[in-house]
């Protein structure tokens, strides 16, 4: 087992004895974008995360990282054991659903994929499954917008119900590069799905590009005067998972949000966390998301103490206001 980084003191419990959010690193940072041609294998990534002191990893389900359909009962048990041997837990799973956009494929096809994902996650002791709409921002072309929206709601309701049986949450990561990327659309959808184990994956970079720049929203973008901070306050009650990274409003390949090292962008993290408030404090995990960042190998090392400080100072502020 690799030695864990021990150079920084850690707060692991609050005064009332409850745990604080643990910090994970997303594995897609080493397989997408600048790493796509020479992706790190998953074992190398896990060793890096452990060596640098992360509490856990968030699994990118895109090959060559663990794809749920590639595993048997024996091999999934071995994968879980190898991750645990490094002292790491798993914060969530982001499956590869590119061929099954939920508003466009037959519902049975999407639900079949979700059954495989649920089986994999149950074996891996993963309680959070990340999804998106897959469809481009312009919306589905094969069917009317209203019909597509109704199908999306039905499919995610049924998916959430299936995951609930195993104690799992389904979280939607809204972002500029996919359909339903306006603040009002995001709020409406999560309320229309209306399942207790369905919620939002709030990514600080996507929130910034969406609220402050109206990225890929089309004509008459829906901007929020308070940017990502106002967006956080608007969605706080629906947030079930959190990705933190900086943003300057730019897009990767004119598609979706660039993810910049902390301090290289415009996000006011203390204000954003304060706007999220109690829901953020009660999350089990905060995940560092370096998707598409060419300097990840260096900057993900530097990010961990920054995020720890943000977390600990945020919890101190919450405690000082009487919130536990």
How would you label these PLM feature ranges?
Residues 1-126, 195, 199, 274, ...:
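N-terminal pre-domain/capping segments
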Residues 28-33, 60-62, 95-98, 134-136, ...:
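Active-site beta-loop-alpha junctions enriched in small/polar residues
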Residues 39-41, 71-77, 107-115, 145-156, ...:
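Charged helix-capping and loop-helix junction motifs
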Residues 63-73, 96-113, 135-148, 215, ...:
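Surface-exposed, active-site-proximal loop segments in enzymatic domains
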Residues 57-60, 90-95, 127-134, 170-173, ...:
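Short beta-strand segments at enzyme active-site cores
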Residues 285-306:
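A short, acidic, flexible beta-alpha connecting loop/helix-capping segment that sits on the rim
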Residues 56, 93, 156-261, 266, ...:
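Acidic/histidine-rich catalytic cores of soluble enzymes
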Residues 6-12, 82-86, 101-202, 298:
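Active-site acidic/histidine proton-transfer and metal-coordination neighborhood
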């Amino acid at each position: 087992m690799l030695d864990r980084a021990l150079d920084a003191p850690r707060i692991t419990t609050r005064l009332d004895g409850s745990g604080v959010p643990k910090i994970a690193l997303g594995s897609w940072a080493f397989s997408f974008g600048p790493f796509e041609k020479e992706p790190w294998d998953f074992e190398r990534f896990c060793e890096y995360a452990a060596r640098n002191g992360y509490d856990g990893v968030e699994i990118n389900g895109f090959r060559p990282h663990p794809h749920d359909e590639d595993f048997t009962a024996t091999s999934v048990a071995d994968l879980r054991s190898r991750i645990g041997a490094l002292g790491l837990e798993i914060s969530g799973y982001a499956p590869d659903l590119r061929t099954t956009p939920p508003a466009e494929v037959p519902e049975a096809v999407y639900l079949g994929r979700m059954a495989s994902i649920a089986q994999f996650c149950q074996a891996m002791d993963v309680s959070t499954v990340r999804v998106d709409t897959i469809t481009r921002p312009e919306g589905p072309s094969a069917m009317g917008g209203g019909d597509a929206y109704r199908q999306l709601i039905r499919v995610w309701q049924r998916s959430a119900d299936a995951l609930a049986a195993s104690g799992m949450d389904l979280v939607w990561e809204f972002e500029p590069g996919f359909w339903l990327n306006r603040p009002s659309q995001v709020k409406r959808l999560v309320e229309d799905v209306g399942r207790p184990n369905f919620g939002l994956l709030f990514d600080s970079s996507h929130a910034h590009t969406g609220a402050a720049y109206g990225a890929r929203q089309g004509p008459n973008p829906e901007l929020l005067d308070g940017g990502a901070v106002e967006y956080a306050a608007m969605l706080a009650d629906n947030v079930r998972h959190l990705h933190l990274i900086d943003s300057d409003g730019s897009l990767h390949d004119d598609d979706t949000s660039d993810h910049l090292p902390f301090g290289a962008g415009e996000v006011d993290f203390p204000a954003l966390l304060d706007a999220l408030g109690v829901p953020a404090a009660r999350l089990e995990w905060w995940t560092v998301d370096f998707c598409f960042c060419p300097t990840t190998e260096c900057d993900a090392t530097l990010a961990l103490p920054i995020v720890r400080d943000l977390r600990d100072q945020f919890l101190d502020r919450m405690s000082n206001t009487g919130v536990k």
